[in-house]
Swiss-Prot record:
Keyword Nucleus: no
Major subcellular location class: cytoplasm
Lineage: Bacteria, Pseudomonadati, Pseudomonadota, Gammaproteobacteria, Alteromonadales
Protein known as: tRNA1(Val) (adenine(37)-N6)-methyltransferase
Function: Specifically methylates the adenine in position 37 of tRNA(1)(Val) (anticodon cmo5UAC).
Keyword Chaperone belongs to the record: no
One Gene Ontology term from the biological process aspect of the record: tRNA processing
Catalytic activity annotation: adenosine(37) in tRNA1(Val) + S-adenosyl-L-methionine = N(6)-methyladenosine(37) in tRNA1(Val) + S-adenosyl-L-homocysteine + H(+)
Amino acid sequence: MAFTFKQFHIDDHGCGMPVSTDGVLLGAWAPLSKAENLLDIGAGSGLLSLMAAQRSEAQITAVELDDTAFHACNKNFIASKWQSRLNLVYASVQEFCNQHTDGNNAQFDHIICNPPYFKGGTQSSNRLRAQARHTDSLTFHALLEVITKLLAATGTASLILPSQSMTPFIEEVEKSELWMNQLTNISDSRFKAPHRHLFTLKHKATKLAEDDTVITNNLCIKEPDASYTPEMIALITGFYLKY
């Protein structure tokens, strides 16, 4: 399916994880204003990289393992006005991490990722969708190891996960060299419990220089009449044609 945003176009045909509200929320919410060297883990169609290119002046490296998604992402990058700042790498993030840390390559001051989150259970019959959604392809432990190695000392990683994945993810974070310093709980309406969570991670060493209190707030997506809330509109106004 094709999606036209205000400043770029996405064709996600054949991608395991198509354009979604989750991706748009993460791309619009992540604190990217000071990003100079950004990594997109599991780029898919390139949505997060293109949103980051619109919101910052960063040089962006996108890593994608799936062949179909890689080619779709490449086409979307070439069609954008930020092609000169977008670098697409065909590899698993573990392979990329090993290659990148083997030399004198700079670490990334921002990492963005909409990670796979289903663990066990019945996988989709669509191989690409299963790979994009299930942690068999990238466990939380492996993801946090990669972020720890690739994130600059004062850098920030931005992610999104559903509620059912937060407890096992936080357990892994607590065993890692990272800590969660910002959390936004997302609900569909003011009368429903949060179902998604946007959050940032930083190196634990930064807790010596910062207040280690987690900055927590809430975001409600829709009003009772199903229209978007002012808070949601404020996030997406730079991207959705209607707003």
